[in-house]
Each structure stands twice: as structure tokens, then as C-alpha cells.
Regions:
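One-carbon transfer enzymes
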Residues: 2-250
Length: 250
């Protein structure tokens, strides 16, 4: 299946470029409490290089594949360690086994919290995939490098819940996956960092399309170029994705 790729990354505010510390404007935009290598405003030390501390929010099979790709970044040898802390937040489920993300986290011995509990640890960046809960501004601001959303549609189309179901019901012929930066107060609104599109297979069900987009989403979390700087959240996450890409290629 041919994948059409579109990348979109807006201009950074002055002072947020490679080799420079983020300006106050950029820190406010990205939710930075302080400069990398300094204090985050709550007394915690903000890291400017790996290994990173990541909190993942997700529920379904699509989210599980994104989590699996991030989890693969943890065990590459101490000298190449990219993530030294990966914890998971999911939502309560009526099933005793829990949702796919919880099943994977338990099997992989990752710490799991049930929303609204998000733990009390310190993290560098958050990652959201198919979570279905609106994150408060106070929560977003706890992450020095902000929170990224991996969303199974070509935003802005089908922002909000059940994008795969809407894609099928409305007969869309093209869909995709978007990686974007989360903003407070609204679902799936913020700068688009990366977007890839695929044709919708004819007569596909929502479950079949979810499988297609799960593979695409995981592939995007494995294949993104390394940025020249880690001084802002966008650069941090593209660096993570590039390193994960190398893990899966080796």
C-alpha cells in the first residue's frame, strides 16, 4: 500500500530554534516551566537530553501499537538508553482483563494508572493516543516538553472521539494518522507535526481500518527524522521517534 506523506511544522517563536534556549513566548506556548537544564518552576530538574521520562495515555488497539513502539526504545543498552521511565494511564474497563493498552502494560510490567489518577511522578513529555478524555491545562503544564497526540485521522477532519467509525460511516476514501501538539480545552486542536495518509480499503469495517491505521501509527512512531536540537518539545519528540526507528531497523 502506497503511503502518501505530508509533514507540517510551523515556524517556532523567536528564541526556540536549534542551539538556543526557548524564549518566554515559546515556553508559554509549549508549556515549558523552565529552560532545559534548569528548573521547571516546581523545583524539578528539567532534562535536556535522553534518557527521557514519558507518561503514555491510551486505551485501544491503535494506542497499544503506539505504546509498543515507545516501549521498544527502553532496552537498547545502557549507553544508548532513550527512555528510562515509561508509565501508562488508561480508563476503567468493565472487562476483568482491561483495555488493550492496560493488557500490554501489565504484560510488560509497566506501571499503570486508571484515570483520573495520573500518578505523582516527574515526566519530561506526555504521549496520548485514543484516550478519549480531555486533559486539563494544569495537567498539560506538568510536562516540561508538553504532550503529543497520535490521532487516527487526517486532522482537522474527524477530530474528537471515534474518528475511525466516522471515516467508515461517511465513506471517506482517504484517511491517515496525525501527530500533533496538544492544546488545552479542546480535543485534537494544535500544531500538526507529522501527518501520513493512506487509501481506505474498499468495503472495510471499522475494525479492519483500525488494524491498517494501527500499523501506520506504529510505523510513524518508528520512522521520523532526528532534529538538530532537543531544546523544545517538538525537537524532543522527533528525536525519540528517530531513535525508535533505528531500534526497529536493527
Amino acid at each position: 500500500m502506497r503511503v502518501l506523506v505530508r509533514r507540517c511544522c510551523g515556524r517556532l517563536p523567536a528564541g526556540g530554534g536549534a542551539g538556543r534556549r526557548p524564549s518566554p513566548q515559546w515556553r508559554a506556548l509549549a508549556g515549558l516551566g523552565g529552560c532545559p537544564g534548569g528548573e521547571d518552576g516546581r523545583g524539578a530538574r528539567v532534562r535536556e537530553r535522553p534518557p527521557w521520562r514519558v507518561l503514555f495515555f491510551g486505551t485501544d488497539q491503535f494506542a497499544r501499537e503506539a505504546l509498543r513502539a515507545l516501549h521498544a526504545a527502553r532496552y537498547r543498552g545502557r549507553e544508548e538508553e532513550l527512555i528510562d521511565k515509561l508509565e501508562v494511564v488508561t480508563v476503567p474497563s468493565p472487562s476483568p482483563r482491561g483495555l488493550p493498552v492496560k493488557q500490554y502494560a501489565v504484560q510488560s510490567q509497566l506501571p499503570v494508572y486508571e484515570w483520573p489518577d495520573v500518578g505523582s511522578g516527574e515526566y519530561d513529555v506526555g504521549v496520548v493516543a485514543s484516550f478519549g478524555r480531555l486533559l486539563s491545562e494544569a495537567l498539560i503544564l506538568k510536562f516540561p516538553y508538553g504532550i503529543l497526540n497520535v490521532h487516527p485521522s487526517c486532522l482537522p477532519r474527524w477530530r474528537g472521539p471515534a474518528p475511525i467509525i466516522h471515516t467508515v460511516l461517511h465513506g471517506d476514501t482517504v484517511t491517515g494518522v496525525t501527530i500533533m501538539q496538544i492544546r488545552p480545552k479542546r480535543f485534537d486542536v494544535g500544531p500538526i507535526l507529522k501527518q501520513e495518509t493512506v487509501p481506505v480499503p474498499p468495503k472495510s469495517t471499522a475494525k479492519e481500518l483500525e488494524a491498517v491505521l494501527s500499523r501506520l501509527g506504529a510505523n510513524m512512531v518508528q520512522n521520523s527524522p532526528m532534529s538538530s536540537s532537543s531544546t523544545c518539545m517538538i525537537y524532543l519528540f522527533t528525536f525519540i521517534l528517530w531513535k525508535v526507528s533505528n531500534i526497529f531497523k536493527s
